[in-house]
Amino acid sequence: MITPQQALTRLVEQREIFHDEMLALMRQIMRGELTPVQIAGVITGLRVKKETVGEIAAAAEVMREFALEVPVQQREHLVDTCGTGGDAAHTFNISTTAAFVAAAAGARVAKHGGRSVSSTSGSADVLEALGVNLALTPEQVAASIDAIGIGFMFAPNFHGAMRHAAPVRRELGVRTLFNILGPLTNPANAPHQLLGVFHADLVGILVRVLQRLGSSHVMVVHGSDGMDEITLAGDTLIGELKDGEVSEYTINPREFGLQPCGSDALKVWDATQAKDMLLSVLDDLPGPARDIVLFNAGAAIYVADRAATLGEGIELAREAIRSGAARDKLQQLVAYSTQAKQA
């Protein structure tokens, strides 16, 4: 057992917290055994030192341990499209839109998310605007995924132990370990993942964290314009975990027949605008919004092992939108979640 004081001493000296020690420290935080000052000291110390793969993996293990489990029965092709947020791009909900497209193409989507971090509309905000009921039990979310191929887990409902750290995070107002733990702690434990990150340095780190956590097929992505998505603006840095091996490379929209475009055409200022842009994509309106969803949904389909290549995934995404299947998937989730609320 490591005390908060011992951990702080280690961090001030720029030394790593070992795996078992990090497990113990994180459990103390999750149980409410540390004071707000101690929590602030530890997470700030980790940030200043720079969190290692081992420290992040241990913290994620504990957060998963304390989360409510979503007991999905059919785990093959189960994928999450959750990102860190924090890129301040103010774009519409690309990964949420991509989730419906991927589900329509045969992936099973366990979408994990919350309210806005730095954008004007988080995944929960836009889904609520679309009529999705966020207050489902773990069993109801699992049933949704098994029945219609997609379910949404509103993060605060599944990570109750985070209440001990949440006020500290808000008051500190700077990025800490907890900003990157959310996408690593899917309550359905999805083995496939498309994870967008707010800084290029996190690509190599988080793909190796997911490797340690036992993920199957993962892409961690960061756009050259700073987006925590696969971008149309230029290159995207990719960290891919496949067949137990990690590779890092870049991709560009031109390689896949997509028109390069900056993020201005993707900006929204509230959940209503985000909803309208999401619906325009699902209605197959040509333009940058549809193209960036094709790019990201294609990647989600690929990492869910529903396509052999990213290019094939993009074509499957294109057909899912063109056929109306992606729009149908949204309507199915609205209907299923509303029915569950009334049950």
Curated annotation (Swiss-Prot):
Q: Which Pfam families does this entry report, sorted A to Z? A: Glycos_trans_3N, Glycos_transf_3
Instruction: Please list the residues that bind Mg(2+) 1.
Output: S95, E229
Give an example GO molecular function. magnesium ion binding
Q: What domain of life?
A: Bacteria
* Primary enzyme class: transferase
Annotated cofactor note: Binds 2 magnesium ions per monomer.
Q: Which residues bind 5-phospho-alpha-D-ribose 1-diphosphate?
A: 83, 86-87, 91, 93-96, 111-119, 123
Its Enzyme Commission number(s) read 2.4.2.18
Q: Which UniProt keywords apply?
A: Amino-acid biosynthesis, Aromatic amino acid biosynthesis, Glycosyltransferase, Magnesium, Metal-binding, Transferase, Tryptophan biosynthesis
Among the record's GO biological process terms, what is one? Answer: L-tryptophan biosynthetic process
- Reaction(s) catalysed by this chain's protein: N-(5-phospho-beta-D-ribosyl)anthranilate + diphosphate = 5-phospho-alpha-D-ribose 1-diphosphate + anthranilate
Residue numbers binding anthranilate 2: R169
Please list the cofactors this protein needs.
Answer: Mg(2+)
Q: In which pathway does it act?
A: Amino-acid biosynthesis; L-tryptophan biosynthesis; L-tryptophan from chorismate: step 2/5
This chain's function reads: Catalyzes the transfer of the phosphoribosyl group of 5-phosphorylribose-1-pyrophosphate (PRPP) to anthranilate to yield N-(5'-phosphoribosyl)-anthranilate (PRA).
* Similarity field: Belongs to the anthranilate phosphoribosyltransferase family.
**How does it associate, per the subunit comment?**
Homodimer.
Q: What is this protein called?
A: Anthranilate phosphoribosyltransferase
The protein's organism comes out as Thiobacillus denitrificans (strain ATCC 25259 / T1)
| Lineage, top ranks | Bacteria, Pseudomonadati, Pseudomonadota, Betaproteobacteria, Nitrosomonadales
Underlying gene: trpD
